[in-house]
Amino acid sequence: MLKIAVYIVSLFTFLEAHVTTRNNQRIEPLSDEMISFINEHPDAGWKADKSDRFHSLDDARILMGARKEDAEMKRNRRPTVDHHDLNVEIPSQFDSRKKWPHCKSISQIRDQSRCGSCWAFGAVEAMTDRICIQSGGGQSAELSALDLISCCKDCGDGCQGGFPGVAWDYWVKRGIVTGGSKENHTGCQPYPFPKCEHHTKGKYPACGTKIYKTPQCKQTCQKGYKTPYEQDKHYGDESYNVQNNEKVIQRDIMMYGPVEAAFDVYEDFLNYKSGIYRHVTGSIVGGHAIRIIGWGVEKRTPYWLIANSWNEDWGEKGLFRMVRGRDECSIESDVVAGLIKT
């Protein structure tokens, strides 16, 4: 009976935190009122601020491009690992950037711009990290988000969204060429869309209101790049789902490098500035894919350390932290990764 009572109290607390409004009235998303509500909330654990990345809720929905696979899709497409054979001690703090300092890509923050390609960015970022990590620094390749969004038809609809797991399957089956940002213009197929600014003042142009269309698939490299398209491809050896278990996810990161994860984005997240995010208020907006690079504990609150794809001016220098170990916003339910072909 005691266990049931504790469960009911815990459930009530959870639901209360997820439907909280001011004076029982819905708070307008992206508004100053929502920002104030979050910053004044005693249990939020994070700070909100004004952002120009999203001009409206409809605008934000378009850019939330991570689609969820159902259980059958996951089961039929790739195995799920539980790492029961990995007997490694899990530290309270772990940062892939410090573990593998020779792999500079781990510290890199990309920008998907005005395109719902987060599913592709989370994938190529983690793949890029893993190429360096799993080769012991012997290989280095910045994989192209453009090649993935334009040529992987099974993945989804490019700038209109896609499946993170299928991106990893594509890496194994078809391979992905290299490609940096529009600004550095490196590799076979650099990203065609510019980095854009989240705030009124900054070093990048304003994000604007234009939503980019998915580029056509071109199996050629940019002019002046010497390696042919097919020869520039890098392949994975295996793609897999990571079991919905905090310790399994941690072990996978410790052994093989950052992973890609997708989570449910609520209205309050659109104003995230700093701290350890947990859902405080607002309805669901859509799905977003990111790269988990580590974890830690602050003031007894465990968190995931996460790299976003909205450039380094957003959040904590391009990163954010989210409560760990309770599947906050389903972030531990949709984790995918893979091994490189050696």
UniProtKB/Swiss-Prot annotation:
- A GO molecular-function descriptor: cysteine-type endopeptidase activity
Asked whether the keyword Disulfide bond is assigned, the reply is yes
Under the heading CDD domains, the entry gives: Peptidase_C1A_CathepsinB
Q: Which UniProt keywords apply?
A: Disulfide bond, Hydrolase, Protease, Signal, Thiol protease, Zymogen
| Residue pairs linked by disulfide bridges in the UniProt entry | C103-C132, C115-C159, C151-C217, C152-C155, C188-C221, C196-C207
What Pfam families does UniProt report for this protein, alphabetically? Answer: Peptidase_C1 (PF00112), Propeptide_C1 (PF08127)
Tissue specificity of this protein: Intestine (gut).
The active site of this protein is located at: C118, H288, N308
Family named by the database record? Belongs to the peptidase C1 family.
This one is known as Cathepsin B-like cysteine proteinase
The gene it comes from is CATB
